[in-house]
């Protein structure tokens, strides 16, 4: 029997590095004492009114343009209703059917030398939630004896980049995530530190029989805080689903939690549908209607993107593809290389020294 086809889509959440939160004047920063960067707006006190952060809106437009998305002339914020301890308002200000950015793609260079185009369904804006820390000897959620909630992160501007289900292997997923991370870092809209949570990635994965056009039952995986974790979690889930199907079991649509220490996923909850959140338009925030002039000003400010920079290093500097890839993988290496060359170092010598 032919192998089943793996179908993967990624939802990447990006914390923006604005000075203040999305809808209030509280400081946006990592590492402060718990519950110190809070106010009536981000804590959801009655009577407090949100005011959109213009810098954050400019950042999502910049991301959308870099991903070749269409910037919507009219988009709305919605209330996404659900109950959770780290949601002080019991709803999250997000976007539903009218996001800022629609369509688009990201081209990624695969290890075999081929190029994969991954479609971008949408890029939308929302506020982040607070952070819950579960206390247990093992550090596992299901064994927690208590939970602590820090609302410093509540209200931080968050951009969600949703890919099409175009990814066919864990290796492709890892390559896509690296390329997206490099793109976001080059735009200077986020520090994209997965270990600090400023870039978080959820994966939707299903298996389908060969020559089938319909997708299989989708499972969402959460809690992957590195590219390596993403690959490991997807490989485990492929093996788990394959064994289940071979044993005649039915795959359940659910959200699963990745346990890095155990190297396995475990069931967290049933997978929600959009209607479970009872979306409705946010009455306190007007529509986002960026002018064409503002969009073009942002487009003109875009830097050289990672893929174009790699091609230039190979074409004009004579660097090998693998060397160019290392130099462009993070902004610090890129800046160091560019500055070293500006000071007179030969291209190859500078690249060898840095890599």
Positions of PLM-derived features:
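Short acidic alpha-helix initiation/capping motifs at coil-to-helix transition points
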Residues: 301-308, 314-318, 328-333
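Histone-fold and other basic nucleic-acid-binding segments
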Residues: 318-355
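Basic, nucleic-acid-interacting segments
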Residues: 1-304, 315, 321, 342-346
């Amino acid at each position: 029997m032919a192998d089943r086809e793996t179908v993967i889509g990624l939802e990447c959440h990006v914390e923006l590095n604005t000075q203040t939160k999305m809808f209030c004047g509280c400081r946006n920063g990592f590492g402060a004492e718990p519950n110190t960067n809070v106010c009536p707006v981000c804590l959801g006190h009655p009577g407090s009114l949100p005011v959109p952060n213009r810098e954050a809106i400019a950042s999502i437009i910049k991301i959308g343009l870099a991903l070749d998305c269409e910037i919507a002339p009219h988009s709305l914020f919605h209330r996404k209703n659900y109950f959770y301890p780290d949601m002080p308002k019991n709803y999250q200000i997000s976007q539903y059917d009218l996001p800022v950015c629609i369509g688009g793609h990201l081209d990624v260079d695969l290890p075999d030398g081929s190029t994969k185009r991954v479609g971008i369904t949408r890029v939308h804006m929302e506020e982040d939630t607070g952070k819950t820390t579960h206390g247990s000897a093992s550090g596992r959620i299901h064994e927690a004896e208590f939970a602590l909630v820090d609302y410093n992160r509540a209200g931080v501007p968050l951009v969600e980049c949703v890919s099409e289900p175009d990814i066919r292997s864990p290796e492709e997923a890892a390559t896509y995530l690296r390329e997206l991370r490099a793109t976001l870092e080059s735009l200077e809209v986020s520090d994209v530190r997965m270990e600090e949570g400023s870039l978080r990635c959820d994966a939707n994965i299903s298996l389908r029989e060969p020559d089938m056009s319909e997708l299989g039952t989708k499972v969402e995986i959460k809690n992957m805080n590195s590219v390596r974790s993403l690959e490991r979690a997807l490989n485990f889930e492929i093996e788990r689903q394959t064994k289940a199907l071979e044993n005649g079991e039915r795959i359940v649509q659910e959200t699963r939690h990745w346990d890095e220490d155990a190297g396995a996923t475990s069931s967290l909850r049933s997978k929600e549908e959009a209607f479970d959140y009872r979306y409705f338009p946010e009455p306190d925030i007007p529509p986002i209607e960026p002018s064409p002039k503002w969009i073009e000003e942002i487009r003109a400010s875009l830097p050289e993107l990672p893929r174009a920079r790699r091609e230039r290093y190979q074409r004009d500097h004579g660097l090998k593809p693998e060397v160019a890839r290392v130099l462009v993988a993070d902004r610090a290496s890129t800046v160091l290389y560019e500055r070293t060359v500006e000071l007179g170092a030969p291209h190859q010598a500078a690249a060898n020294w840095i890599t």
